[in-house]
């Protein structure tokens, strides 16, 4: 079975501004490096379809989604750093659709595994809020599709982005079908290191200058026992 590569053209066409960290160039660079290394010939490429309303509302409240649509019509900001335009909101729905379809293809046996290469990002978006360039939590949409539609009893969401997955924690805290393991730079956005809010969440703040091998050693010591005990049917890694 092949590895799936899920993406969409909106990733490359909409910019949040010259000072934004979420820029089309980061997706372009991945495509360029894949072509240079011949990885592109070893994956099956899928152009994402937009997520359904049901996919989105398993994660976000109707009021929040309406707020995003209202802001998009004005081209207004959700937070100081997070712009909402029709194009960015369309991209967020496509990114969620890519994540859901990737999980569906893995679970039905069409693919061995999948890489979802999309923007805008999502893990700072909670049930009723967004921020940090995140509008829709695409990983959360994929997890909820897996547990509520596709038959998974347990899903592990492993987040190793430099920033804390505050949106994902807001969505999944207390959900016994999901194990959230989150490592992040302790001094980075969203600022302040709060303890995990539920037993199914493990936060691993890392000090500035932590080496990769040091972080890996902590993950092996603190996370692997939890993963073995949880025995997930599916694991998602947010990078």
Model-derived features: where do they sit?
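Conserved alpha-helical scaffold segments that buttress catalytic/binding sites
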Residues: 100, 104, 115-236
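Metal-dependent C-N hydrolase catalytic cores
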Residues: 2-146, 152-153, 205
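Calmodulin-binding IQ motif helices
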Residues: 239
């Amino acid at each position: 079975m092949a590895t799936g590569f899920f993406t969409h053209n909106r990733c490359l066409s909409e910019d949040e501004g010259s000072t934004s960290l979420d820029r089309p160039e980061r997706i372009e660079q991945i495509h360029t490096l894949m072509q240079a290394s011949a990885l592109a010939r070893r994956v099956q490429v899928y152009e994402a379809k937009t997520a359904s309303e049901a996919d989105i509302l398993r994660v976000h409240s109707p009021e929040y989604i309406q707020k995003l649509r209202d802001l998009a019509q004005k081209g207004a900001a959700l937070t100081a750093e997070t712009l909402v335009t029709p194009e960015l909101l369309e991209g967020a729905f496509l990114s969620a659709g890519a994540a859901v379809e990737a999980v569906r293809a893995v679970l039905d046996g069409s693919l061995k595994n999948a890489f979802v290469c999309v923007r805008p990002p999502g893990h700072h978006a909670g049930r009723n809020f967004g921020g940090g360039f995140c509008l829709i939590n695409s990983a959360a949409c994929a997890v909820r599709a897996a547990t509520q539609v596709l038959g998974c009893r347990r899903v592990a969401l492993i987040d190793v982005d430099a920033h804390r997955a505050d949106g994902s924690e807001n969505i999944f805290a207390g959900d016994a079908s999901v194990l959230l393991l989150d490592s992040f730079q302790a001094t980075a956005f969203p600022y302040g290191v709060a303890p995990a809010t539920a037993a199914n969440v493990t936060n691993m703040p890392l000090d500035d200058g932590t080496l990769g091998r040091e972080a890996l050693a902590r993950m092996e010591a603190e996370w692997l026992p939890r993963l073995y005990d949880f025995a997930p049917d599916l694991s998602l890694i947010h990078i």
